[in-house]
Amino acid sequence: MEEYQVKIDTFEGPLDLLLHLINRLEIDIYDIPVAKITEQYLLYVHTMRVLELDIASEYLVMAATLLSIKSRMLLPKQEEELFEDELLEEEDPREELIEKLIEYRKYKDAAKDLKEREEERQKSFTKPPSDLSEYAKEVKQSEQKLSVTVYDMIGAFQKVLKRKKINRPMETTITRQDIPIEARMNEIVHSLKSRGTRINFMDLFPYEQKEHLVVTFLAVLELMKNQLVLIEQEHNFSDIYITGSESIHGA
């Protein structure tokens, strides 16, 4: 029986997930609370396993690294005596990870800046003159909303599992025959069309069955990947809303 696996391009690796957690939890990157970040990281990896997503081995390596750093942080600090009045403190176990995160953040920021500049150049060459007053209003409104990532969606799905009191991994294999993800995608699209308004992400999970919860989430991810839905969130930890894209309402 063929397994149904979903691999999301937005998963850029464990450093990307760690940066996401640091930003969302408003943590100082130079003073990472290892116990807290490890707990959140493992929760995300666990949720990805529940969903049977195609997880790269690097995520598991990072999990082991975080646990190692956490255990070293719990050990009593040792100081090596050099001279009578000089002591050398042991190296911070987080130092190497912090350096990697800072470098990765610089790379991400630079890539984002280049992409924005390229988009601006394309607009200046392709967009004809027009009245920008209404456009300015739309931009101002959109800037008030956060850019929702796949990691945000996984965090929202964690809330679903908690509300449904489902914490253990799936024991069954999701297959095309058992649970038609395409059919669930069509149901969500139909709901968006019939309502003509956005839907709260939590309202997509009316049933208790684990299989239905998982297939619904995977259906949303596929709709996101195919740009058939728009995802909105007003601020950190607030509710997430699903809106049909123009291609849905225009069909």
From Swiss-Prot:
Specify where it is mainly localized: cytoplasm
Q: Which cysteines are joined by disulfide bonds?
A: none
An example GO biological process term is: cell division
Write out the entry's keywords from A to Z.
Answer: Cell cycle, Cell division, Chromosome partition, Cytoplasm
The source's domain of life comes to Bacteria
A GO cellular component annotated for this chain's UniProt record is: cytoplasm
**One MF term in the entry's GO annotations:** identical protein binding
Question: Which Pfam families does this chain map to?
Answer: SMC_ScpA (PF02616)
The subcellular localization recorded is: Cytoplasm
Q: Which family does it belong to?
A: Belongs to the ScpA family.
Q: How does it assemble?
A: Component of a cohesin-like complex composed of ScpA, ScpB and the Smc homodimer, in which ScpA and ScpB bind to the head domain of Smc. The presence of the three proteins is required for the association of the complex with DNA.
- What role does it play? Participates in chromosomal partition during cell division. May act via the formation of a condensin-like complex containing Smc and ScpB that pull DNA away from mid-cell into both cell halves.
Please identify the protein, giving its name as recorded.
Segregation and condensation protein A
Q: What organism is this sequence from?
A: Bacillus subtilis (strain 168)
Q: What is the lineage of its organism?
A: Bacteria, Bacillati, Bacillota, Bacilli, Bacillales
Gene name of the record:
scpA
